[in-house]
Amino acid sequence: MESTMGAESQDDFEGLFDDMQLDSTKLGRTVKDRSLVMSKIIATLADITLNVDDTKIDILGNAYEYLIGMFAANAGKKAGEFYTPAGPAELLSMIACDGLTDVQDAADPCAGSGSLLLRVGNHANVRRYWGQELTSQTYNLCRMNLILRGIKYQNFQIFNGDTLAEDNFGDRPTVFCKYS
């Protein structure tokens, strides 16, 4: 496994797993229990053959989005802070991309988990994804979601901050979809 330390991508991966709580009692009461759970998860993931180059089905990305959706459903009202359900996300992306095959920039000022941005990418060839998200946990979810879906770090820029108080887009795209 390669490190991003000193690489061009270092800033893009900085803090990606900061919100992971491996000491949470939800994983087990003791350190030994938590270690066993994490070992089983890692071993299970290592045993899965994911040859994403040979298939159009994004197994890991779909599983990740499914888990985000399940978490959102169980989170109740708070879920609206980070997850746009599949139906509305699909409709919005279809409307935004109507008649487009290439999109220079797709931007979401309240990116959440990034599912809406990714849906736009299902309807048009998006060159660059932009987003901003207020909460650090959801900001990291968004970045992980884009990475797991095969979006190269050079092709997205997600900011962590309050879009209304501090718009990090500046002179960057501020529309949802920009025609190429």
Predicted feature descriptions by range:
Residues 1-96, 157-163:
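Non-catalytic, mostly N-terminal accessory regions of nucleic-acid modification and defense proteins
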Residues 78-177:
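Conserved S-adenosyl-L-methionine
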